[in-house]
Amino acid sequence: MILERLHNNEIINNMSLESKFVRDQLVQPIFIHEDEKNETTIPGLGKNKILFESNIIETISDDVKNGCRNFIIFFVPKTKSNNQFITSFQENILLKIKKEFGSEIEIWVDLCLCSFTTSGHCCLFEGEKINYADSLEIMSDIALSYVRGGADGIAPSSMLNGIVH
């Protein structure tokens, strides 16, 4: 199988170069909190800040002006739950970003349940045991939501077995 996307997409092609280092191999992390209204510096991550809906386009625009075209988004939902995972905020943010920038940038999205769950774990539990089936199903639903929003890639960071085959 020929991976057409590598050949037809300059940004992805540059990310996979082996013999030289180019700016397109760098990925800017973006942290977006659903309920945050003020920029907050993230301890231990230099000048990275937790962003919010009203400043995300301006922030990405500034990064693009500085030559950054690859971004990975880490969403922090307002409400934590172990049984209800609403991704409309995330999907709408992605749609907004893609509408503004189109194929000028690549957007990857972190996939894990840890920011969604009340426990902060990468999975759902049934009693004291990991519920693999429900965890994988929920993560699949979240990934599909990101794709509907226009994410160019999904970056599974979950420590749960079975996420990546």
Residue ranges, per PLM feature:
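N-terminal amphipathic alpha-helix/helix-capping segment at the start of soluble metabolic enzymes
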Residues: M1-E39, P43, K47, E58
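Hydrophobic faces of well-ordered beta-strands that scaffold small-molecule active sites
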Residues: D24-I30, F71-I73, I105-L111, I154-P156
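Glycine-rich, proline-tolerant flexible connector loops at the mouths of alpha/beta enzymes
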Residues: E39-L51, N66-I93, G153-V164
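N-terminal active-site wall of soluble small-molecule enzyme domains
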Residues: K80-K99, I105, L111-E126, D141
